[in-house]
Amino acid sequence: MLFSGVYNYSTDALLWDDFLAGNQVAYACMYERYAKVLYNYGYKIAQNRQLTEDCLQDLFLSILETRNRLGRTDSIKFYLMRSLRRELVRRLQAESRFDADPDAIEFRVEFHYEPTWLDAQVSADQSAALLRELDVLPPRQKEALFLKYFDNLTYEEIAGVMGIEQSSAYKVIYKAIAALQKRVDTGVLLLLLMVAKDH
């Protein structure tokens, strides 16, 4: 990590406030903290490395250039994910990669079986079955589960990132979990979601 010790911001609010005040170290720290997460999320939407990198670079340049007009936020990750998603959707629409409906995004996240401590808790067959079921969920449900359990966003933040109402975020995640519960052992599902929360 490039910025530790004195530049190790304890909260996003403090980091954002320093960035808004023009602190270049805060800007660099913010980039270091969130660029990889943003790239991974953006790539799942765009499936294009160059486009994802371009949008990510443009996003960080844009917030630097417009920081005097930006408001406060308690969650930089949420703010940046929402902004990146909007820009990717705009550019993909311009390229006619999907129609004008942002819900048409094919959110591509594949869940792969990798031996972990989860194997000590459940059989390899159960783990593999659950991961196969995750792979066949509709893209919107996969994205919502990914944001909730792998990126640890709140329902309000998920709604903001995906451009939906908070009640819709609850429903999408509920439907995804309900679909999984019908096809896999509930205990295995709970273990996976607990593992995801820790990452």
Segments the model singles out, each with a brief description of its role:
Residues M1-V37, I63, H199:
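N-terminal module of bacterial RNA polymerase sigma factors
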Residues N8-Y9, R90, F98-S123:
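Internal acidic/polar
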Residues R85, V89, Q141, E156, ...:
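DNA-recognition helix of helix-turn-helix
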Residues E65-R72, R82-P102, S123:
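Arg/Lys-rich amphipathic alpha helix in sigma70-family domain 2
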